[in-house]
Design a protein with these regions (language model features):
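An aromatic-glycine-centered, glycine-rich loop/turn in mixed alpha/beta architecture
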Residues: 1-27, 40, 57-68, 74-75, ...
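Nucleic acid-processing catalytic cores of prokaryotic defense/repair systems
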Residues: 27, 34-96
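P-loop NTPase motor domains
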Residues: 56-74, 308, 407-422, 427-459, ...
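Switch/coupling segment of Walker-type NTPase motor domains
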Residues: 81-110, 125, 489, 493-603
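Surface-exposed, low-hydrophobicity interaction/linker segments
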Residues: 98-108, 273-360
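Conserved P-loop NTPase motor cores
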Residues: 327-328, 458, 465-485, 490-497, ...
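Conserved P-loop NTPase
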Residues: 803-860
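D/E-rich low-complexity acidic segments and tails
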Residues: 883-938
Length: 950
């Protein structure tokens, strides 16, 4: 008898598990492919396209390129999504901090690097700016019954036959590769969407209108595949519902453990008049970028095949012809203008049909939806009304019912809510929307300059050394603009922020406002201010301002010593030419223009040579020797030069031979500001013969000061980030050696890692230098009113002329007419970054942590400041006379002035040097009583920067 086996208890297994079905049509995401029950779509991210400051031919080329790519997608459905992503402030801060090589040490009591970087981030986050992101979904293939069955049993099939589970995607691989190549061409410039892109698109579509989460803005490399159960990460916690007949749909979701509610109004594009893009109108999808709130777009398009279009077009042409005959034959009337335009279009279409429908005249139809959100229904409706007003009168924007279904259209894979408001046209018409048109200028690792102020608002960061270190380009930069356009303000901003990040700067500012940078507490220990008109004799010796080449700078040459000797010879020749120009400029015009004058000067200069230990006095001595040898004119020239030598400012050319080079300091200063306050320069554009003796000397001193500025380039390590800033450079273009200086800086800026800023009122002065336009890298153009100057500025920007951009330069930095206060509005510039980006930007220095910098760079005169100083001085004198004490002016041993210099510089002798060119305030020498200390505190802060520094 057979024994029965004991019965085993059955395990629960997987049969009892509930099946999860997503609340959206999407069923899986695999790489950049999304799958629904009936369709597979490939998603791509479109590159931003520059539109501003392009010629009409360049814009038409872009439109035709996009149209040709759309024409290649015949027979396919497309889903276009335009969304926004908050500007990645933390990523910029990390890149900026990493790029700040050899930055300045922190100074006790001053703005530290961490505080500076935190302030930049907080200010940038407060501006709430975002990047526009454009995604395009392209239908790959429909799904068969077998494909849907394989997806349903994928968990089991993946264990039994893994290859069968992947068969659908492998079968589509060649078609996907073909689509990748089509959309990657110029025009769309699309790349397959990454996992981060897909995740962001899904969240922004499912949670339409909700604030962007900070956690997803830095979404790292995510999973390549999302199954149906994984899609719950996007849908759970987000709910859409609409009250009956409500004009908006409510979106409720969780954001950082808080419930957030938004009202979303979905609009649709209706009838559209003829738009003339690019001759008159801008791309119609770009209009929404001008609004001060985010706008979402969703467009569903079907690219029609030629055989589907031909019959329909012929029927439409027949209707138009019948209507024309009805007016002209039946009633003997002229047809309406709109009907006449349709008749012209009929002739064009008939020609297209007879020649065959090409890619550029392929037809399509589609639906364009717009979504705006608000905290409540009233705000959402108000924003929707702004969209309607923005597009009037040429484009009608409709506000349909069934907002819930229209809102779901934004989610990839969802079906159309309605076929109402279908728009038909050619691919050229659809391409003229240019959805990816945006403002693109600068980079994402440099200092923050401000923001774009065109149709698209974006932060503008710029690394002045990216061109030299990465892109192997020159570091030449032009800053052009009329009086009050903000050139000095922009220069000071660039110098300050890059100095904090580790650069070394030498600034020549003849008028002197940028010298205030050396008094800022965080910069003072590393800065020096030299007023050249009060400096040591010989600081502008023409033989010393030209740097002597160093052998280590030629280590990468094939024959370093030979290259070094060649450069030494060139430096000596430059010194001789510079001395010749300077001494000729010191002579009266009638004497200098005589041919014999140049001959005798050239002979004397050649005799003295070009060694760096020479000085112009030796040239005068040589002229006198030649006079004694019978050269009478040499004596005349020597007498004139000796007379000029007696002028106070001429002593800068003739060194005291008992001293060392006055330029060489005892420390490596990070910032050196050279000023020439009190120097009288000639009127710009005035001929040489009208210059006075003082003006002629001033031009030569300015030329020598510019050469002295560039000397720092060659005195330090060539790999260090260095910068030179030169103001009043329009005079350099009038002096031969000034042109040589500009050309030399342009050519050596890459090799020696230099950013050279040339500021001038007129672009023509810089264009006068041969090759400047081809060597310049970045350009800033401020407000310019003269028509000729505007055209020259556009040439410098490499922007097409004669197409209407000239007038825009006269509208920069507008000021309200009714405003009677000081014009402290942020200045605007046209910024060309040297790498193809050209945009109008607004310089931003409104951050609270930079308030002291804004005050230091404020060059606007203010009579109230002088009145405050005058009244404070009167009060000080009254206190001094009333005390009757003989030692009232004595400075206390532990008084504030005793600490001021110590906080700025570590050595006592350096404190004395910094105070040489400052006006001492008698108020600081008082032992101020307690009851008047508060009254005088403001004056002390304004007039004694060392006290403020402490």
């Amino acid at each position: 008898m057979r024994r029965r086996r004991p019965r085993r208890r059955a395990l629960a297994g997987e049969a009892g598990l509930p099946r999860y079905t997503p609340r959206i049509a999407l069923r899986s995401i695999d790489g950049h492919l999304t799958r629904t029950a009936h369709q597979v779509m490939a998603w791509y991210r479109l590159a931003g396209q520059a539109w501003s400051f392009r010629s009409d031919s360049q814009r038409e080329t872009l439109i035709r390129q996009i149209a040709a790519q759309l024409g290649e997608l015949q027979g396919r459905w497309l889903h276009l999504r335009v969304t926004t992503r908050p500007y990645p402030v933390h990523r910029w801060a990390e890149a900026f901090d990493k790029n700040a090589v050899d930055r300045l040490p922190d100074v006790a009591g001053a703005l530290s690097w961490d505080a500076f970087l935190e302030g930049e981030q907080r200010h940038l986050m407060g501006l709430s700016m975002a990047d526009k992101e454009v995604f395009l979904g392209v239908e790959v293939s429909g799904r068969s019954m077998l494909d849907r069955w394989a997806e349903r049993v994928a968990p089991i099939l993946g264990k039994v036959a893994p290859a069968a589970a992947r068969a659908e995607l492998e079968a589509l691989s060649s078609e996907v590769a073909h689509l990748d190549s089509i959309v990657a061409g110029p025009g769309l410039d699309a790349v397959p969407a990454s996992a981060e892109d897909i995740a962001w698109l899904m969240y922004r579509s499912v949670a339409l209108g909700l604030p962007a989460p900070r956690t997803l803005t830095g979404f790292g490399p995510g999973p390549a595949r999302w199954d149906a159960e994984d899609l719950a990460a996007f849908t759970e916690g987000v709910h859409l519902y609409q009250e009956p007949y409500a004009p908006t749909v409510q979106v409720i979701g969780r954001l950082r453990s808080q419930t957030v509610r938004r009202h979303v109004a979905v609009l649709t594009v209706g009838l559209m008049e003829g738009l003339y893009i690019p001759e008159v109108d801008d791309p119609w999808m770009q209009h929404s970028d001008r609004l001060p709130f985010p706008v979402e777009w969703s467009a569903r398009m079907y690219i029609r095949r030629p055989e589907e279009v031909t019959g329909e077009l012929q029927r439409q042409m027949g209707k138009v012809r019948s209507q024309i005959r009805h007016y002209t034959h039946d009633h003997d009337l002229d047809p309406p203008a709109a009907l006449a335009r349709q008749a012209e279009r009929v002739l064009e279409i008939e020609d297209e049909l007879t020649t065959g429908l090409t890619q550029l005249n392929t037809r399509l139809y589609g639906w364009w939806r717009i979504a705006v959100s608000g905290r409540d229904e009233a705000e959402a409706i108000a924003r929707a009304q702004q969209v309607l007003e923005l597009y009037r009168p040429k484009v009608r924007i409709e506000h349909p019912e069934a907002q819930y279904r229209y809102a779901r259209e934004f989610i990839p894979g969802e079906p159309l809510a309605s076929t109402a408001y279908r728009r038909r046209g050619s691919v050229l018409w659809a391409a003229a929307a240019v959805p990816a048109a945006t403002a693109s200028v600068g980079d994402r690792r440099g200092i923050m300059l401000g923001e774009t102020c065109t149709a698209t608002r974006r932060p503008v960061a710029w690394d002045p050394w990216l061109a030299q270190e990465v892109r192997r380009a020159s570091g030449l930069t032009a800053i052009v603009g009329g009086l009050g356009s903000g050139k000095s303000f922009l220069t000071g901003l660039i110098v300050y922020k890059t100095l904090r990040a580790g650069a070394r700067w030498t600034v020549l500012d003849p008028s002197g406002p940028l010298a205030q940078l050396t008094r800022l507490p965080e910069l003072a220990p590393f800065s020096r201010h030299i007023n050249l008109l009060r400096a040591e004799p010989g600081i502008l010796n023409p033989y010393r301002v030209v740097a002597e080449p160093r052998l280590e700078h030629f280590a990468d040459e094939e024959d370093p010593e030979r290259a070094w000797r060649r450069e030494r010879s060139l430096a000596a020749a430059t010194r001789r030419r510079l001395v010749l120009d300077v001494l000729t400029g010191l002579l009266p015009y009638d004497v200098a223009r005589l041919p014999h004058t140049r001959i005798v000067l050239l002979r004397a200069v050649r005799e003295v040579g070009g060694a760096p230990d020479r000085h112009p006095g030796m040239v005068i001595d040589a002229l006198r020797r030649h006079a004694r040898e019978g050269e009478e004119h040499a004596g005349v020239v020597a007498d004139f030069l000796a007379e000029r030598r007696e002028l106070p400012q001429a002593a800068l050319l003739f060194p005291d031979t008992s001293r060392e080079d006055p330029w060489v300091g005892d420390r490596d200063y990070r910032l050196t500001v050279l000023t020439m306050q009190g120097m009288t320069l000639p009127r710009p554009g005035s001929p040489r013969e009208e210059w006075t003796d003082a003006e002629g000397l001033a031009v030569e001193l300015l030329n020598l000061a510019s050469w002295l500025t560039q000397r720092t380039i060659y005195d330090s390590d060539r790999n260090l980030r260095k910068g030179v800033a030169l103001d009043e450079t329009h005079f350099l273009s009038q002096v031969p050696t000034g042109k040589v200086l500009i050309d030399r800086l342009a050519r050596d800026s890459r090799k020696f890692n230099v950013r050279a800023l040339f500021a001038s009122q007129l672009a023509g002065d810089l264009l006068r230098v041969s090759g400047f336009a081809s060597l310049v890298n970045a350009v800033f153009v401020g407000r310019t009113d003269d028509e000729e100057a505007q055209a020259e500025a556009l040439r410098l920007l490499k922007v097409p002329t004669g197409v209407g951009y000239e007038a825009m330069l006269g509208t920069l930095s507008p000021r309200p007419r009714e405003d009677e206060g000081p014009d402290d509005t942020p200045r605007q510039f046209i910024f060309a970054d040297g790498h193809g980006g050209v945009e109008k930007i607004r310089v931003d220095l409104e951050a609270p942590h930079l308030e002291h910098l804004r005050r230091a760079l404020d060059t606007n005169p203010n009579a109230t400041r002088a009145a405050a100083r005058s009244s404070s001085s009167d009060a000080a004198r009254a206190l001094s006379s009333g005390s009757g004490s003989a030692d009232a002016g004595a400075l206390p041993a532990d008084g504030p002035a005793g600490d001021a210099g110590a906080s700025a510089h570590p050595a006592a002798d350096e404190r004395v040097e910094l105070l040489d060119d400052e006006e001492l305030d008698l108020v600081d020498d008082l032992d101020t009583p307690d009851d008047t200390r508060d009254e005088l505190e403001v004056v002390q802060q304004v007039r004694v920067p060392r006290e403020a520094a402490r």
